[in-house]
Amino acid sequence: MNPFVNLFIQHSKKQIFLNNNKNNILLNFNSKLYSTITYKNNNNNNNNQIINNKTIMKRKNNEIIQTEEDDDNDNGGIHDCDSCDEVDNEEIIPESPPSKKLQQQQQQQQQQQSKLKPKQTSITDFFSPTVKTSKADKISPFFSNVNNASTTNTTTNNKNVNKKTTTTTTTKKRNNKDEENEDDNEEEEEEEEEEEDKKSKKKTTTTTTTTTTTAYKKKSSPKKKKVNPTENKFSTINYKDDQYVQKEEYSSSKKEKLENVKIGGHVSIKNGYPTLIQSVVAQGFKAVAFFTNPPRTWKHHTVKLDDSIKFKQSCKSLNFDVNCILPHGSYFLNLGSPNKENLQKSRDLMIHEMKNCEILGVKHFNFHPGSHLNEISESESIKIVAESLDYILERTKDVVAVIECTAGQGTNLGYTFEHLRDMIALVKDKTRVGVCLDTCHMFAAGYNISTKSNCDVIFQEFDKVVGFKYLKGVHLNDSKSTCGSKLDRHENIGKGHIGTPCFKYLVNDKRFQNIPMILETVGPYDQEVKLLYSFIEDDDKK
């Protein structure tokens, strides 16, 4: 059986259809496609060679030899169709060999075509353009002209067998040379790429070495700073069992100050009373303030006995001085109110809060005296405050009622030392009455305590008018408002109009020792506590 191949070449789209047995193969190339299908037939019919896709079949002495495996055809690469039987009956008439001139012309044409021929791309899905042959018979490709391609080429191919054999040898040599040239070009390109890679590696190594050297220079060990032995090391404070004991040894006078100056802050009780003292000690507090009742309500909240027991135990275990606990009263309290209903509410609420202090074992309770509301005079309102204190002290035990000075905002009482003096003077049991000085309130009320000299004068006046024996607490606040503005606006220590001299004066004056000094600033309190303790001076070095 002889294969019958129909070539349909479309010049516009440059497509080739091969109809071979049951398979239709469509090939698309970006340029001219040169395909080769050779057919050799001798008169003895000893050898029949079929080239189909990737297979070359031989028929010799009624034996089929398959040179390559075929994965695409179902028939195992055997070409079998009825149309091919008709071709077997035709006779092939060999032509005389061509002359030398014709051979030279053909070679020149082939060389010109080879220059125009693009590089062949491998198509794994179909078959490679270069046809593989057996060792016995090597068949060279036949380059057909696309413009003159038609069905007549099949008959001319059968007639020009000798012509093919002569031309195939020349084309084989040319193809081998082309392949060698392509291999040489590929080798040269590979060598160039290797050289470029080496250069790039050298560059990267140089850059890495430079970066490592620069990084090494940057990572050089820093020079150690020389420490002066005379430098003040007070900034390092230990907050363990020995509170505020410094790493360096101090004189006895400074140690006494560190032990007797009681600084703390106003904290929340949202985490409960049992853990309150532990938390404030961890922040370096030696004094503390809190609300025993919500500050903006008339409702009464009673401290639980279990909480009070744990609170007392924590105070004893941590050696926390109970006299330095100064709870704050509700903002609704107005013991000088001209309104009888509100006056009674205020008295009942303060009684309840002072009883909470009794349950906790606390000995002092701080409150704002109230206001006259422009309905009565200041002196009349001060008398009502004193009467309210007598009423409350008769119904409570042991707890001292501590009157806080005010900024004089609105119609508030207590913005002068004389107001405080008159209230105390009218109270029957003076042992249970005390005073709390707020630095911001004093400054806003007109007491300019921004300098040390002014502090000397003002606190001497306080001692004459009221007396330090009634001083039970101090609120440490800087002021956002100016002196005499009568605006109660707290600021962090050293950041307001008062400045640090006043607070340095307070922590170094013995008259303020063992008195709770409470911060009511925005915080954080632990940093401000350290700052205030750093203001303590050594009297022996003066």
UniProtKB/Swiss-Prot annotation:
UniProt cofactor(s): Zn(2+)
Motif annotated as Nuclear localization signal, chain positions: 222-227
Cell inner membrane recorded as keyword: no
GO biological process per UniProt: base-excision repair
Keyword annotations from UniProtKB, A to Z: Coiled coil, DNA damage, DNA repair, Endonuclease, Hydrolase, Metal-binding, Nuclease, Nucleus, Zinc
Family recorded in the similarity comment: Belongs to the AP endonuclease 2 family.
Organism: Dictyostelium discoideum
GO cellular component, one term: nucleus
Binding-site list for Zn(2+) 1: 328, 368, 404
Top-level taxonomic group: Eukaryota
Catalytic reactions of this protein: Endonucleolytic cleavage to 5'-phosphooligonucleotide end-products
Name assigned to this protein: Endonuclease 4 homolog
Gene that produces this protein: apnA
Known function: Plays a role in DNA repair. It cleaves phosphodiester bonds at apurinic or apyrimidinic sites (AP sites) to produce new 5'-ends that are base-free deoxyribose 5-phosphate residues.
Annotated coiled-coil segments of the chain: 171-206
Biased composition (Low complexity): 99-115, 147-170, 205-215
EC number: 3.1.21.2
Residues given in the record as Zn(2+) 3 binding sites: 441, 488, 490
InterPro entries, per the entry: AP_endonuc_2, AP_endonuc_F2_Zn_BS, Xyl_isomerase-like_sf, Xyl_isomerase-like_TIM-brl
Residues binding Zn(2+) 2: 404, 438, 475, 520
